[in-house]
Each structure stands twice: as structure tokens, then as C-alpha cells.
Amino acid sequence: MDKTLSREEAKQLMQLLCLDMSCWGNLPLMRRQYLVKCKEYHPDKGGNEESMKLLNSLYLKLQDSVSSVHDLNEEEDNIWQSSQVYCKDLCCNKFRLVGAIYGEYYEAYIMKQWDVCIHGYNHECQCIHCILSKYHKEKYKIYRKPPVWIECYCYKCYREWFFFPISMQTFFFWKVIIFNTEIRAVQPLLR
């Protein structure tokens, strides 16, 4: 997220969305609030035209920046092969949400065993948490710089970005964000 908007632009956007800066990076929440504020600021509904223009320009700039980060990640990521995860159903649509793809099985796939997966003890585990953690480690080895939140959607990047401790509560909020994220953003699941 540090490659998307300048600090001032990010503050302006979060003020227009009426969200605290601690929510910066929670894209599903920001999207929901953007839609609410569009209705509130719309000039035809009695809103402030200048606020609407600024909100639209900042939000569209954020969307374009996030898309370019995702596209850059797709170009950089030669560490995943289709033989690792093969998809031939509707989940091949990269714009579907992770939660829509996994449906009722999401809870079973997000993490297999808390005590084992949270510390990375089982290197063979194929839960979403462990796959994203392995992706994070591989990316770090290849590019010699740690990926950050939005470049990487692993639980570790989420915690470090928002300065959260390891806890069931932070894990719950992370899994809600992953549930509402496009599958293309968490691309190792598809490759």
C-alpha cells in the first residue's frame, strides 16, 4: 500500500471516506465506504460537488495503483506453477472474490491447525494461510526485500502493516479481508 498514494493523498481519501487511518489497506471496507460516500457527496442528492470530485479522483488513483501493483506482482511471480494448484472451474475468473470461490468450505481451507500453521511447522500444509506464507518467503528469497501488505496478502504482512499481534481476533479480521478480496490479488492460490 505504500506504493499507491502519497501520504497526504491517503489522509485526504480516508477523511473523505470517514475512516480512521488504521483502516488504510482494508480494501473491501474502503470500497464499501466509497460507495456510501458517493451517494452522500453526489451533487444531484444535495452533496458537495468538490468533495465528490476529490473523492472520485483519489479513489480511482488508488484503484489504478493497486491494479498496477497486482499486475507487477503477476509479472514478477514466476515462483508458482500451474501444477501446484490447477483450476478448471468458475474459480479461473480472476475477478471473483476468494469467499465466492471457496463458499461454505472457506473456513476449512483458511487454516488447518492454528498451533501448527501459525508458526509454520508443517511445510506440506496446503491451507490458504500456509500457501500465502510460503509465497511470502519465496518472494523474499528471490527479490531480497520483504513484501508488504497488498504486494503480499499473508497474515504476517497484514499484522506487520497494521502493527497487530498474533491473536485469534487479528486472524479473524485478516480472514474477513481475504474472504472479500479478488482471487487475482491472492494469486498463488490460482497458479
From Swiss-Prot:
Pfam families attached to this UniProt entry: Papo_T_antigen
Location in the cell: Host cytoplasm; Host nucleus
Record organism: KI polyomavirus (isolate Stockholm 350) (KIPyV)
ZnF region ranges: C4-type: 117-130
Molecular function terms, GO-annotated: zinc ion binding
Protein name as it appears in the record: Small t antigen
Assembly and binders: Interacts with host PPP2R1A; the interaction inhibits PP2A activity.
One GO CC term, this protein: host cell cytoplasm
Keywords: Acetylation, Activator, Early protein, Host cytoplasm, Host nucleus, Host-virus interaction, Metal-binding, Oncogene, Phosphoprotein, Transcription, Transcription regulation, Zinc, Zinc-finger
Cited Gene3D superfamilies: DnaJ domain, Small t-antigen, unique domain
UniProt comment concerning the protein's domains: The common region of ST and LT proteins comprises the J domain. This domain is essential for multiple viral activities, including virion assembly, viral DNA replication, transformation and transcriptional activation. This domain is also required for cyclin A-transactivating activity of ST.
Cysteines engaged in disulfide bonds, as pairs: none
Zinc finger map (H1C3-type): 136-157
Keyword Metal-binding: yes
List of residues that carry N-acetylmethionine: M1
Biological role: Promotes efficient viral genome replication by accelerating both G1 and S phase progression of the cell cycle. Inhibits host PP2A by binding to the A subunit, thereby displacing lower affinity regulatory B subunit. Inactivation of PP2A in turn results in the transactivation of cyclin A and cyclin D1 promoters. Late during the infection cycle, ST may induce dephosphorylation of host MTOR, leading to the inhibition of cap-dependent translation. May establish and maintain high levels of viral genomes during persistent infection in cell culture.
Ranges for domain J: 12-80
